[in-house]
Amino acid sequence: MAKYLVIVESPAKVKTIKKFLGKNYEVAASNGHVRDLPKSQLGVDVEHDFEPKYITIRGKGDILANLRKEVKKADKVYLATDPDREGEAISWHLSKALKLEGKDVNRISFNEITQSAVKASLKQPRDIDMNLVNAQQARRILDRMVGYKISPLLWAKVKRGLSAGRVQSVALRIICDREEEINAFIPEEYWTLDAELKIAGEKKPLLAKFYGDSESKMNISSREEMDRVMAEISKETFKVIEVKKGERVKKAPLPFTTSTLQQEASKALNFPISKTMRIAQQLYEGVDVKGQGTVGLITYLRTDSVRISEEADAQAHEYIGKNYGENYLATQTTAKKSGAKIQDAHEAIRPSDINRTPAMVKDSLSRDQFRLYQLIWKRFAASRMASAVYETTNVKIGAGNYRFTVSASKIAFDGFMSVYTSEDDEKAENNVLLKSIDESTELSLEKLDEKQHFTQPPAHYTEASLVKTLEELGIGRPSTYSPTITTILARRYIVKENKNIYVTELGEVVNQIMKESFPSIVDEHFTANMESLLDSVGEGTVNWKTVIENFYPDLEKAVEAAEKDLEKVKIEDEVTDVVCDVCGRNMVVKYGPHGKFLACPGFPECRNTKPYLEKIGVKCLKCGKEIVLKKTKKGRKYYGCENNPECDFMSWSRPVEEKCPKCGGYMVMKGSKIVCADEQCGYVTEKKEKNQE
C-alpha cells in the first residue's frame, strides 16, 4: 500500500487533518518557517543579482531531521501549508530543505480545514507557485534591507535595540502626523438651538432642531449672534411648512476580510488586533467540538477578498430561507471591493458550515473563541440576507424667516438586522408625535434651549482606525497589519490608553530621524506603490529582482548621506547640572525604553540613575515653581509642576509665560498659535518667535 506524507505548518492542523485521512496518510508539522535570512548579516548578495543566503532557523534542525525520516517512508509528499504567499514560500523552503526535487512533490491548498475541502485538494495537486514564492522573497529581502541598513543608524543616534521597518516606519509616521494635528488643533465655538413646541391636544412637546433661514443652513458662532437669533425667533409664529414621508434602504454588510474583522472585533469585543488573529487562528486550525471531534470552524483568516464560494452561498441561502423565511433572502448579495489593492485569491472569512450555529458550539469553545465565532457567523449570515428598510419622516417648520427640522425613522423590515447590527449602525428614532402631523397642525413655542459647543480635534488612532487607514492607503496586507502594530508597541514608539494610541517621546525622535534621513521610506505613496509591485510579482507580471534592483541603490545613497549627516541629528549625551549623589559626577541625559532619564557617566562603576525632569522655562501659575515635561506611566507626554504632588497643575499642551489678556488664565501652544487654555474664553494669538520650541 502506498504511503503519503502531508506537511502542514502547525501541530493543531495535524490533529484536525489526521482524522480526515486514512491510515496510509501521515501528517506532520514544520512549525512555521524552517529557513530564513541569517540574523547576524544582511543575508543578501548585493554583488551577485541580490541572491538571498538562507539558513536553517535555530531550533528547526530536529524538526527537519524528523521530516526527512518521514519523507523517506513516503511514496508521495503533499505540501499543505497556508493558501497565501507566506504559505507558498514555506512549501518552497521545505522542498529545498528536505531535498524533495526528485520526489513526487505536490502542493495542495484549502481555504477551510474540513474533510470535504482537504479531500478535494488531494485530488487537485499542483506545482509550487513560484510567482507567489518570489513575491514573498522580495518582501522579505526589502524588509531585511531596510531594517539592516537603517536600524544601526538609530542605535547610533538614539539607543541600541531600536528598529526601522518598511511598513512599521510608515505606520509610525501616520500616527505622529495625527498627533501633530491634535496638538495644533484650536477649538472653534459654535451654538445649537432646540425649540420645544406645543402641539394642540398633545401633552408631550415636540423637539425641533434649528436649521437656518429660508435660504440655507446657518452656523452660529457666538453668544451675541445666538441672542439676536433667539430674540427674533421668539416673536415669530411656528408653523409646519412641509412633511416628507419616505423610505430608506440599508444594505446588508459585506462578509469579513482580515481588516474588517480586526476593526469590528476591536469595537464590538474590545479585542486587541493580536488577540483577534490568535483566536481566529485557533478557530481556523481546529477546535474540539463535542460529538464532532476536531473541527475547523472558519475559513482562512488572512484575506482581503469578500468573495464567497458558490457552495457556501447556496448553503447560506438554504439556511436563511428555512430559519428566517424567503423574504429574508438577499435578492442580490453585496459584492463590493474596496481599498487600494485587493488580492482576490481567497474567500472572505466565514464559518466553514453555517449550519454549525454559535449556540451549537458554545459549550466547546472558550468565552473569547465563542464571541469571535459568533461575530463571524452573524456577519456572514447577514451578508446573505435582505436589506433592512426604514420608514422616514422629515418635517420642516418655519418661524418667520427661520427654519427648524424634526426627523424620525422606524424599522419597517429588519432584514439582515434580525441577525447582525454593528456599532456603526444608525439607531431608529421613532417620534410618535410625527405620525399625525401635517401642514395644518397648530404649533406654539414653549421654550428655546441654546447650547454652546466647541469643535473637537481629530480623534486619536485606535488599533481599529489605524488598520482601516493602512488598508485605505494600500500600506501593508492582511498578514502585516497585526505584526506591524505589535512591533511599534513592543519598541515603545507608541502606547495604548483606553484603546487610544499615543506617540511616546521615543517614537517622536525615531519618526523625526526617519523623516529627515529617509523620507521615501516613510512616504505612504512610495510604500503603497511598493506593495502594489509586490502584488504584481505574485501575479507574475513583474520580476522580483527588478523590484529589489530599483530599490537598493536609492536606499544605499540615503544611508550614506545619513551617516555623513550623523552628527547633525545625533542626540549627544547632554551634561546636566544635576550632581550624582553617589559619586559626585555631573549626570547626563540618556534614552531608555521609556524616553529620557538621567544616568551617571561613571557607568559601569557607578550605576546611579534618576528621572529626567525637563524644565521649559515657564513658572507654574498656581505656585510659582518650574513647569517640567513629564510622562505618564505608559509614556504619554504632559506638562506638570515640579512641586507635584503638593501642586496639581497639569496640561497636555505646552504652557507659555504670558497670561491671557482676556481672562487672566494660562495659555498654551497650539501649532503656530498661542491660545487660552480655557475654551470658554477663546482668546487666540500668533506664536511669538521666542516661544517656539
Language model features by range: what are they?
Residues 1-140, 211-212, 220-223, 227:
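Intrinsically disordered, low-complexity regulatory segments
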Residues 2-5, 16, 25, 97, ...:
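Basic, low-complexity terminal or inter-domain segments flanking catalytic cores
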Residues 16-20, 66, 89-97, 117-121, ...:
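Alpha-helical scaffold elements adjacent to nucleotide-binding pockets in ATP/GTP-utilizing enzyme cores
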Residues 82-83, 159-163, 245-254, 266-272, ...:
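Conserved short loop/turn motifs at secondary-structure junctions
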Residues 116-195, 246:
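C-terminal or mid-to-C-terminal helical accessory/interaction module adjacent to the motor/catalytic core
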Residues 139-149, 167, 197-199, 248-260, ...:
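Core structural elements
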Residues 240-243, 251-265, 292-301, 457-469:
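Short acidic, hydrophobic short linear motifs in intrinsically disordered regions
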